[in-house]
Amino acid sequence: MSDSTPLPPVRLPSEAELARDALATPLLSRAARLARWAGPDTRVDSGGGLVEEQLAAAAEALGLTGRSAEGGADAGAVTDAEAAEEAQAEASEAWRAAVDTGLVEVLDEEEGTVRAGDNLALLTSGSPAEVLHIWLDALDAAIADASVPDFDDLMDVMDEGGEIDFSSLDWDPQAEAEFLEGVLANLYLLTADERAPEGAPVPLPALAASVVVPSDVAEPTDAMMEEVSTAMMRLDDQFRILAPTGLADFRPVDESLLIEEGQAAPQTPDDEPEDLERYGVVRLTPLGLYGLRARLLDAGYAAPALGDLAGKGADALLDGTVHYGPLAARAETEQWLARREPLAAARELLAAARGGDADAPLRRLHCQQALSLVGTEAEPALREVLDDPELGGLARVWLAEHGAADIPAPSQELVFWLTVDTVAAQLAAEGNSEELVALVEGLAAQHSGFFDTAWRVDHPATAEVLEAMGRLHPDKRIAKEARKAAYKARSQQAG
């Protein structure tokens, strides 16, 4: 994923709603409870972790004692000792989150004493943005923890002096972090894609395959599928760690599918939804979408949210929505128009649509689409540009669609210029789509001698459009005519 190409825009709830969601997450709510529970007798070890002797009391303060802490499907099969151990582990994680987010501060490292951190008060008196900043710190820490090997693996490589021999681990910290970051980025993209059903969960095997199998591979090899299975189990462990942050709704891999040493059954899941769900599914929450977007922005990616452009000028709107899908572009435009008077908005859009740069045709297409959302109050603005060589064509289209009278007939030069501009915009928006192929066929069929005139059109994209028509038209004779016309257009531009 390139950090220069804008990501699809996402629709986010308000900061107030997101902050409420953050406060309700298991990890942050437990961290806050432990921060308030801590007192003068609370002690931490050299790493800031709660001392082992106080874990049971911390678990009790969180209400995690008794049955299995999470109360899962197999809770009845868990012994009291196992339940207590699990509860203490979750209490330890919550305490670590309290320290990582500044809800608790270590007063004296030698004595192991603590006090409430300054951020604790912000959870109740701070702004939504301040609450979300605290939650983001918890998320960052959880993502870092999820990239670290399992504790049992660390114990296996501990030497006699109690030091961990990291060289004995089959673990590359950077590669592990990059793997998880890649998975989370792909989950973000899958969630942001407007073609995907809203709120649809992503099967864990598909998510694993997205970072293992190259995009240009149609049929994965057996070795690739084995790697997907291994990656799926890594993700199962990692999302178990991340789920309490509220990042995602997660259904783990069905334990009946697991065989010795914690590996998944090798067979590929069927396409039936019930079967896929047994292999684990994950759905990014609105809070998770917000969190991953914040991380992507920090990493330098262009990760827009719907509404970002509503307060900016028309030039920012038309340039910004160039890479949006049609639904997102319309939603962004509706928010932009809602803040403006129709006539003033139309004039601003038309002024921003001018230009001879490579993005200008798509900008004019988006201008035309935006103007379709404006009522007849905008008519004076459209009449003002009827003689404009770049805008006169779309102005006539708008006036005709709105039933206006006294629309001057366009010149042949304007008709052909608008045709080239329209095809150039469609090329930029859709590439070689079926709709564009149909448009190309229709143009060649409707206009006798089309190519004899088209190559003379004074438009920066004339040669590119004619080359595309030669590439897309199914009739070899007509395609050859288009290529010849493109050559003439190139020669004319060079001269």
Residues covered by each model-derived region:
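Short inter-helical turns and helix N-cap capping residues of alpha-solenoid HEAT/ARM repeat scaffolds
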Residues: V281, D357-A360, D387-G392, D458-H459, ...
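Charged, amphipathic alpha-helical linkers/stalks
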Residues: V281, A299-T333
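Structural detector for internal amphipathic alpha-helices that build alpha-solenoid repeat scaffolds
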Residues: D319-H323, R330-R340, L362-L373, E384, ...
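Alpha-helical adaptor scaffolds
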Residues: Q335-L337, V397-F450
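Short, amphipathic alpha-helical interface elements at domain boundaries
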Residues: M1-L103, E109-I134, A146-M224
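Amphipathic alpha-helical scaffolding segments comprising HEAT/armadillo-like alpha-solenoid repeats
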Residues: F239-I241, A314-D315, L343-R354, G375-L386, ...
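Accessory beta->alpha helical hairpin/"wing" motif in late/C-terminal subdomains of nucleic-acid enzymes
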Residues: S92-A94, T101, E105-A177, T230-R240, ...
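Alpha-solenoid HEAT/Armadillo-like helical repeat scaffolds in large eukaryotic proteins
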Residues: V253, D308-L309, A316-T321, E348-A358, ...
